[in-house]
Amino acid sequence: MDNVQLVHQLTCDFEGHAYLIEVFSRPDGSYFARTMFSSQDVIISDGFSFEEALIRHQDLLPLAISSRKMPLSSRLKN
């Protein structure tokens, strides 16, 4: 993640848990939001603007959290 700059952090509460959302800017003027569940489990949402990246991420975060709570047996397998 060279040349990206952290521009904002906020905490989103969902079902009694707090999740950190970090928003970064890129040199080309675009942005992305990131939440790390673990070092190997990260979701990223891209956007042309700060607001677009953050809104997309906030919309997707509940789905990402819920999908991680699904039993492995009910998940699709390749």
Which residue ranges define each predicted feature?
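A short, structured beta-strand/loop element
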Residues: 19-44
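Generic alpha-helical secondary structure signal
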Residues: 12, 23, 35-36, 54, ...
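Short N-terminal "domain-start" leader segments
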Residues: 1-27
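Mixed-charge, Lys/Arg-enriched low-complexity segments
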Residues: 1-2, 40-78
